[in-house]
Amino acid sequence: MKIDIIGDIHGCYSEFVKLTKKLGYEWDSGIPLHPDGRKLGFVGDLTDRGPQSLQTVEVVYSLVERESAYYVPGNHCNKLYRFFLGRNVQITHGLETTVEEYRALPPSEQAMIRKKFMRLYEAAPLYAQLDNGRLIIAHAGLRRDYIGRNDKKVQTFVLYGDITGETNPDGTPVRRDWAKRYKGSAWIVYGHTPVKQPRIINRTINIDTGCVFGGALTAFRYPEIETISVPSSLPYVPEKFRTFD
């Protein structure tokens, strides 16, 4: 299989368009389709913080509906879904930008985008196992011993990473470096934690290069095992990027 997996978009729609064009996709029909039949993959966190979250949802929904893309949800997707369910979620940490876009729409358009996103989310697997198990897309990663499982523990890991329950001085959760200990043969492609450059270690790759924080939007090409990026148009916020020993 040939697929281009895109990191956390977070409403950075213009960079998404530029990246897909750089990857050879054509937008003649209003969505990115590849002349060679390559498909797109998304590690989740399509929305929040960036300027065009709902447009991003529209395009990804259309791609998945026509089986031209694979999508797995991220923690921001999970929170938006709970908002659309009417749950009492805090409209913070970027959700406020998506909600502002949503509330600016006429009621009929609100109903349509809500229906599309909920359908996209409800149909999505917790993580995607592709190419006969040789490739896995999981928002925050996946431990080798969790592959094939879908229980609550795995759901927490996939959405939030290998959290310890403790917090750093800046309020962010303390996370273990699961990728450093990964010994599996399947490629694990993930995002969630912004890094300045794509981080490849032990057949895992973090492709969240912090587009919404002024970094870049990155795609991982499979089976080529290469990355392609476009720079962000947003201001650079260095403290949002994680470094590893």
Curated annotation (Swiss-Prot):
Keywords: GTP-binding, Hydrolase, Nickel, Nucleotide-binding. GO terms for molecular function: bis(5'-nucleosyl)-tetraphosphatase (asymmetrical) activity; GTP binding; nickel cation binding; phosphatase activity. Gene3D superfamilies: 3.60.21.10. It comes from the Bacteria. It catalyses: P(1),P(4)-bis(5'-guanosyl) tetraphosphate + H2O = GMP + GTP + 2 H(+). Its cofactor is Ni(2+). Its EC number is 3.6.1.17. Asymmetrically hydrolyzes Ap4p to yield AMP and ATP. PANTHER family: BIS(5'-NUCLEOSYL)-TETRAPHOSPHATASE PRPE [ASYMMETRICAL] (PTHR42850:SF7), METALLOPHOSPHOESTERASE (PTHR42850). Belongs to the PrpE family. This is Bis(5'-nucleosyl)-tetraphosphatase PrpE [asymmetrical]. It comes from Geobacillus sp. (strain WCH70).
